[in-house]
Amino acid sequence: MKVICVGDSITRGQVSANYVKMLESRLPGTTVINAGVNYDVSAHVLDRLSEVVDQDPDVVTVLIGTNDATATLGETTARKLRDRWKLAEDISADGYAANLSAIATRLKDETRARIALISPPVLGEDLDSTALRRTSEFGEIVRKVAAEQFVQYLPLNEQMVAHLEKADRTPRVHYRADSLLAPTAAMQHFFLGRGFDSIAKSRGLLLTTDTVHLNSRGAGMIADLIEGVVRSS
């Protein structure tokens, strides 16, 4: 069986705990391919989908939306992403829905794969923040698209929110587009050899290392959801 995991840096797993590697260790005999691209957005996933289709997968999971969501939170981020991917149109919730629907349609039309769309992880761990609520709004878009396209929906965002609600802790750090949390986490990991869980703990974070990328608990939630899809296929 061949499983392709499509996504952004959270899937790529260089500056985030790597859920794709978790799946590889849990699913011996299964080929698990990492199709994550750092900074990716839904429009660019649609543009590069031939790379996925051409590999004749049995299962395709799509976890995209974090960068789309951040683009709707600030013009500076939006401009950087538009320029990076040379996008003709602004990034928006409506555009995200259209792109995700087109991704699902093409995968259905051009592969025999079982398809699963995953709601985006949380941005920050403050349940009352605009950033976290925005990811939940984008998660609802994913749920609706999956229902309309008759593909599987994996409720990652909902599971993360439930985990944070149960923990009932006030985070010490918060998501900000101009935060140095992500680059300093990367420096600690690559130059000092600190694990992502250690970095998260030092910042009082439960699921993320820098309010965007994931520690092993957060990545493990994704692996759990995808493993369930693969084992039932």
Sequence positions of predicted segments:
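Residues that form or flank phosphate/diphosphate-binding pockets in enzymes
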Residues: 14, 43-44
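Short histidine/acidic/glycine/proline-rich micro-motifs that form metal-
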Residues: 9-12, 36-40, 122-125
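A structural signal for the hydrophobic beta-strands that form the central parallel beta-sheet
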Residues: 5-6, 34, 117, 208
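A short beta-strand-loop structural module common to alpha/beta enzyme folds
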Residues: 29-43
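Alpha-helical cap/lid subdomain in secreted, periplasmic
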Residues: 18, 22-26, 46-233
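Catalytic nucleophile-elbow at a beta strand-turn-alpha helix junction centered on a G-D-S/GDSL motif
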Residues: 1-16, 67-69
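Nucleotide donor/acceptor-binding cores
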Residues: 1, 30, 113
